[in-house]
Amino acid sequence: MRYTSLFTAVTAALASTAAAVGVSGAAEGFAKGVTGGGNASPVYPKTNDELVSYLGDSQARVIVLTKTFDFRGTEGTTSGTGCAPWGTNAKCQLAINQNSWCDNYQPNAPKVSVSYDNAGVLGITVNSNKSLIGQGSAGVIKGKGLRIVSGAKNVIIQNIAITDINPKYVWGGDAITINNADLVWIDHVTTARIGRQHIVLGTQADNRITISNCYIDGVTDYSATCNGYHYWGIYLDGSNDMVTMKGNYIYHTSGRSPKVQGNTLLHAVNNYWYDNAGHAFEIGSGAYVVAEGNVFQNVKAVAESPISGKLFSSPDASTNKVCSSYLGHTCQINGFGSSGAFSQADTDILSKFKGKNIASAAAYNTVVSSVTANAGNGKL
């Protein structure tokens, strides 16, 4: 009788643990309603090949990472001639001559020898209806990013780190690429030591995207600004995109943090930018940006000049009241410390937000403690 009771208790405990494995919380903002792999039984890849297979097949899946998956060296290396557009100082990034980029766009740059890891150049394909989640702080992908493209939809990436993708080389690879997709939630993801973009949304329609609680770590040995600050942070360039950025920690970058253009509606709320040696926002034609409740600390230029797109920077309490008719709340002012100016009130863009799923906004004075405690993997 005791053995039966013990067996029953153990079985129940295991079942409870299994049932608890899954996505934590729910997406706010434009990707609200995303379910990823839903209630699919979790799978635990043990090898790189298993991980690639689970992410790329046609089944709804909850994929749990319990270890580091290191792709470096798995697809060989390529050596050749690249270029040094930013100089030959040991701290400068070099460029791979991808699609003759050096020849066509940097013909006067010094030619240099390059040797890069092939695995990093193109990320792992992620198909529709997937949840990729890390267990604790153990879920890490090294040397290769993720690609959510070609019509993929309903995808959740949560609580993992993506690191060490050819950091010396521009065109060496991106951490997360989204292009021609819909309903994608990137949450509690750490990216570090990346050759090109930490997160990039391509020129096709990427539709409804939420990027939340992520840690964009720009500390690097090589950068396009030759100073240890990564330049290629976040690039939002889709033709019909709605992007929520909330609760992210964007640290030690020098540009494109984010660059916004194409036809992109961006709600940037309660993010923390710290220690930027160049510029954070780059707002190009076709960008419609509402920024509220953020903190900019030691950011040389909060927005690169000129601003070609549209911006509502939530400049003051009186002006911010207009938000309530469109976003459902009064916009929160941003906080600044040793940072450049950021004040523009293109109120005509607010109507574009009306009727959409809009993330809530807290006062900026809560942001630093909240973001530093919660952003990145291992902090669920």
Curated annotation (Swiss-Prot):
SMART domains: Amb_all. GO terms for molecular function: pectate lyase activity; pectin lyase activity. It comes from the Eukaryota. It is an enzyme of class 4 (lyase). GO terms for cellular component: extracellular region. GO terms for biological process: cell wall organization; pectin catabolic process. Its main location: secreted. Residues 1-20 form the signal peptide. The keyword Lyase applies. It is found in: Secreted. The active site is at 256. Its EC number is 4.2.2.10. Keywords: Carbohydrate metabolism, Cell wall biogenesis/degradation, Disulfide bond, Glycoprotein, Lyase, Polysaccharide degradation, Secreted, Signal. Glycans are attached at residue 129. Pectinolytic enzymes consist of four classes of enzymes: pectin lyase, polygalacturonase, pectin methylesterase and rhamnogalacturonase. Among pectinolytic enzymes, pectin lyase is the most important in depolymerization of pectin, since it cleaves internal glycosidic bonds of highly methylated pectins. Belongs to the polysaccharide lyase 1 family. This is Probable pectin lyase A. It comes from Aspergillus fumigatus (strain ATCC MYA-4609 / CBS 101355 / FGSC A1100 / Af293). The gene is pelA.
